[in-house]
A protein has these predicted regions:
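Active-site acidic Asp-centered loop
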Residues: 1, 49-51
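Hydrophobic helical membrane-anchoring modules
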Residues: 106-108, 132-204
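Acceptor/aglycone-binding surface of glycosyltransferases and processive sugar-polymer synthases
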Residues: 22-40, 45-48, 57-137, 164-182
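Acidic donor-binding segment of Leloir-type glycosyltransferases
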Residues: 1-22
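A short, conserved beta-strand element in the Rossmann-like catalytic core
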Residues: 4-5, 54-56
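Aromatic/hydrophobic pocket-lining residues that form π-stacking "cages" and hydrophobic walls in ligand
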Residues: 10-12, 63, 143
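Hydrophobic anchor at the start of a short beta-strand
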Residues: 19, 46, 154
Length: 204
């Protein structure tokens, strides 16, 4: 978002690190911030990472290799052999596993960490899963579920995750948050079963 600490501290870095800092034209919200970036990114693929350091840049190499191997999407799992998770709050961990199990059973895609924001996509995927509807953290499930339902291939690798050491997480657990996630999950589920393939990559 425009007012977050990462957004403010990113301003002096472009000349030193080659980082391009953009200001979102939308109101605050995780989903809006990511969508603003997806509208202007350059290149053949894009990776989405948290700005608080919880995701490891080293795992980007594994994502890149998946895309090089021909997959349309590169997904990471924090809960498979080889993955490492540090200081995940227990109540959030329990809820995470329950939600991801439900999504896995509902969509039958065999992926156990759909809610993880850290993923990479080819440009063609981002272009063909529009329009994106999520304003908030529910974008973390809209992106991968639409990609899978619309027929794009994906590879999964173990990744590491470390709880932030400073600052306050913007994500909070509430009935409002749950309803937003449920809306997106049901929206994509209904697309899968009622659209008769109108949005599938083979039907576009």
């Amino acid at each position: 978002s425009n007012t977050s600490r990462p957004a403010r501290t990113a301003k002096p870095k472009p000349l030193r690190y080659g980082v391009r800092c953009i200001r979102s034209p939308y109101r605050n919200g995780f989903g809006f911030a990511v969508r603003a970036g997806l509208e202007v990114f350059e290149g053949d693929a894009v990776a989405i990472m948290m700005a608080d350091g919880s995701d490891s840049p080293t795992d980007l190499v594994a994502y890149f290799r998946l895309l090089q191997a021909g997959y349309d999407c590169a997904f990471g799992s924090r809960f498979m052999p080889g993955a490492k998770v540090y200081d995940y709050p227990r109540y959030k961990l329990v809820l995470n596993r329950v939600v991801n199990l439900g999504i896995r059973l509902l969509f039958g895609h065999g992926y156990n960490d759909t809610t993880n924001a850290f993923k990479a996509y080819r440009r063609v995927v981002i272009e063909n899963i529009q329009p994106l509807l999520s304003h908030h953290f529910n974008l973390t499930v809209e992106l991968p579920l639409k990609s899978v339902v619309r027929g794009y291939s994906y590879g999964i690798v173990p990744v590491s995750w470390t709880n932030r050491e400073a600052g306050v997480a913007k994500f909070s657990l509430s009935n409002e948050t749950g309803s937003r996630y449920l809306f997106i999950i049901l929206y994509v589920f209904l697309e899968r079963h009622l659209s008769r393939g109108d949005y599938h990559r083979d039907g576009q």
